[in-house]
């Protein structure tokens, strides 16, 4: 009898433990189903379980030491954080609705703090709507479709910095609307049309408003087809094009009633002026 009771108690205990394990497993399944998905590649990617939200996080840092030797003077060294960028991008609700945010923290990016002036931490803050592979519509602050060297990220340059021509003549960033039509094919003639209507005041402008706007239009031609891995967006031929690839582009920019010496950049003008820019680019990779 005692053996029978002991056996029954053992069976009941095993069943109870099994039930506990089953419940615990079910609870874990529920918890796991609520966790986001992680991906790696261009930074750290986080996607919600229902795939309605995606966030990619990455940063970029460039530290620089410079040696200076002028004739008749003692040698000198300088060290600086040339660039420090933090970038967020992804989509909300649907992969057709995207966003991008880029912040900068290096002294050369932020600039000197002055009374009544904004701190230039925000570089990009824009939302995109891409209904298909050809059309893109943008609203917010980001780069204008200007010269190629400026459009390319500073992390995709051939050398450590852009040219002095870019520093003087670029149209840089602005706040407004942009619309792109992209028609790229791998092995045949391709072209892109990019347009923008913006404030013309440059990034992070909060001073007095006016009725002047900036208009930008750009045409890109690729006679031998599109570049591998979006090769127009980085200077070196790291993708190793097996056939010649050529990019010819021209942009026209008119900044009506500009307030600054370089349109979107520079110091304040004594009188508002309308500025016009023509930007031509060519890129060959083979």
Task: Give the ranges of each region predicted by the language model.
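Intrinsic disorder/low-complexity detector
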Residues: 8, 22, 65, 194, ...
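Intrinsically disordered, low-complexity segments enriched in polar/charged residues with Gly/Pro
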Residues: 31-33, 75, 114, 269-270
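Outer membrane beta-barrel
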Residues: 42-203, 208-225
